[in-house]
Amino acid sequence: MADMANGYEIRWAEDKDWIPAMHMIWKTFLKYEAVDYTEEGIRNFHEFITDEHLYKSFRQGRYQMMVALDGVRIIGAASVRSYNHLSLLF
């Protein structure tokens, strides 16, 4: 299910989207959010988005993610944990 909005594609993430999405999330976090976090908080966030268990949950459908694309570049992502908890929104 893909939806085009203003020339952008919004769809459920596929396995191939995981690494580019996490990279975009990390870069965005560092640019806009990290200033408000302690070094420990920054490390914890990085560990969260690079955790193999999180990726495994995504592959099993227990951690759902949508991506917004401008062509082939991921420019946004939103994920849901446990089917009802917004986990990441970038």
List each language-model region with its residue ranges.
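Conserved beta-hairpin
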Residues: R62-R81
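Conserved GNAT-fold acetyl-CoA-binding loop/helix
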Residues: W26-H53
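Short secondary-structure boundary/capping segments
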Residues: A2, Y55-F58, A77-A78
